[in-house]
C-alpha cells in the first residue's frame, strides 16, 4: 500500500561522494527489508504537497564539513510555508556531518519546522553523526 511506504527525504544527495558516503551506508543498512522510497528531488515537495500528509517520514540530511546543505534549505522553506503539509505524519531524522558542529542545531531547526507543519516526532527521533562519532560514546555511557 502506497501510504504505508516510508518516505526518505534526502536533500542534496548529489553532494560529493565523500560527503554522502557514510550516510548512504547508514541508510542502506537501516532500510534493508523496509518498503521505502528515497526522494532526492526537492522540487517534488511543491508539486504534490498532499503526498506527505499522514505518512511515515525519515529526513536524511548530510551537512558536509561546513554545516550547509542547499537542498535542506529548500525543505525548510517548504515546511515553513504556513500550511500543514505534514499533517498526521510521523517522522525521524538522521543528521550527518563531517565536523563536530551543526548537527544538533540543524536537528532542532528541522524538528520545529516539521512539527509546525504537522509532523510528530515520537520518542528519540534523532540519529546524529558527527565527524568523529564521539557523540555515540557519550550516549553509550548514559544508557
Please name every model-derived segment:
Residues 1-143:
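FMN-binding flavodoxin-like domain, especially the glycine-rich phosphate-binding loop
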Amino acid at each position: 500500500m502506497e501510504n504505508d511506504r516510508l518516505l526518505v527525504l534526502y536533500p542534496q544527495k548529489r553532494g560529493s561522494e565523500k560527503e554522502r558516503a557514510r550516510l548512504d551506508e547508514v541508510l542502506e543498512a537501516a532500510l534493508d527489508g523496509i518498503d521505502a522510497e528515497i526522494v532526492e528531488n526537492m522540487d517534488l515537495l511543491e508539486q504534490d504537497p498532499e503526498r506527505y500528509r499522514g505518512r511515515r517520514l525519515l529526513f536524511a540530511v548530510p551537512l558536509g564539513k561546513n554545516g550547509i546543505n542547499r537542498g535542506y534549505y529548500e525543505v525548510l522553506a517548504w515546511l515553513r510555508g504556513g500550511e500543514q503539509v505534514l499533517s498526521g505524519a510521523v517522522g525521524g531524522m538522521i543528521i550527518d556531518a563531517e565536523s563536530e558542529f551543526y548537527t544538533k542545531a540543524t536537528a532542532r531547526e528541522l524538528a520545529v519546522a516539521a512539527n509546525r507543519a504537522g509532523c510528530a516526532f515520537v520518542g528519540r527521533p534523532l540519529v546524529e553523526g558527527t565527524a568523529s562519532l564521539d557523540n555515540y560514546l557519550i550516549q553509550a555511557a548514559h544508557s
